[in-house]
UniProtKB/Swiss-Prot annotation:
EC number: 3.6.1.66
Cofactor(s) this protein requires: Mg(2+)
S-S pairs: none
Entry's Gene Ontology BP terms: nucleotide metabolic process; purine nucleoside triphosphate catabolic process
Classification lineage: Bacteria, Pseudomonadati, Pseudomonadota, Alphaproteobacteria, Hyphomicrobiales
Reactions this protein catalyses: XTP + H2O = XMP + diphosphate + H(+); dITP + H2O = dIMP + diphosphate + H(+); ITP + H2O = IMP + diphosphate + H(+)
Keyword Metal-binding tagged: yes
Provenance organism: Bradyrhizobium sp. (strain BTAi1 / ATCC BAA-1182)
Origin superkingdom: Bacteria
TM spans (from-to): none
Subunit text: Homodimer.
Protein name as annotated: dITP/XTP pyrophosphatase
Binding-site residues for Mg(2+), renumbered to this chain: D48, D77
CC cofactor note: Binds 1 Mg(2+) ion per subunit.
One GO cellular component term noted in the UniProt record for this chain: cytosol
Length: 214
């Protein structure tokens, strides 16, 4: 990241084809007066995510979208890190859901592996979500941040809100999963706080350097 930060304004591309992630990003950006258009709306392709870290993959997506659209691009790479599974699925969280984005199957796979390892008690079911955010400009300038939220995994999944692995993730200090929370509760944005979810926490960091509230 450059030592000289750059502010976002005007029109930006949200470099995702994931409807749930797109909705969350638009909600987070709403107070800042930027016009957000999705990669899908611009018919942009999806680059190969060949990075070995969340941050590397976020940068790949943002840089590719900024170059293709010739607009600033905002990308997220995120996933769940299960401690008893040696960090899996990690950067492969989306791939575990397969081409049909079947996160019910992905959650079932995690639970099966946890059971095989004898991880039945809460003390053995620790996990954290990671969100890496990157903003890239067509001239190559980037700004990037990363954040996490810790919790435990429950079974069976609870709630139908959110997306992805939300219904099985119980954030630390709470008695409801992300799947049981409203988007406002999950994000934990003012007046409720400064970020509960991994994406909200990363966004707060990014907003401090790249965005001016209306």
């Amino acid at each position: 990241m450059s030592s000289s930060h750059r502010k976002l304004s005007g029109r930006i591309v949200i470099a995702t084809h994931n409807p749930g992630k797109l909705a969350e990003m638009r909600e987070l950006l709403a107070p800042y007066g930027v016009e957000a258009v999705s990669a899908g709306e611009l018919s942009l392709g999806e680059p190969d995510e060949t990075g070995e870290t969340f941050q590397a993959n976020a940068r790949i997506k943002a840089v590719a979208a900024a170059d293709a659209a010739q607009l600033p691009a905002f990308a997220d790479d995120s996933g769940i890190v299960v401690h008893a599974l040696d960090g899996a699925p990690g950067i492969y969280s989306a791939r575990w859901a397969g081409p049909d984005k079947d996160f019910t199957a992905a959650m079932t796979r995690i639970e099966r592996l946890l059971q095989e390892r004898g991880a039945t008690g809460p003390d053995k079911r620790g996990a954290h979500f990671v969100s890496a955010l990157c903003v890239a400009w067509p001239d190559g300038h980037v700004e990037e941040v990363e954040a996490r939220v810790d919790g435990t995994l429950v079974w069976p999944p609870r709630g139908s809100a959110g997306f992805g692995y939300d219904p099985m993730f119980l954030p630390e200090g709470h008695d409801r999963t992300f799947g049981e929370m409203t988007s406002l509760e999950k994000h934990g944005l003012p007046p409720l706080g400064l970020g509960l979810s991994h994406r909200a926490r990363a966004f707060v960091k990014l907003a401090e350097i790249c965005l001016d509230q209306r």
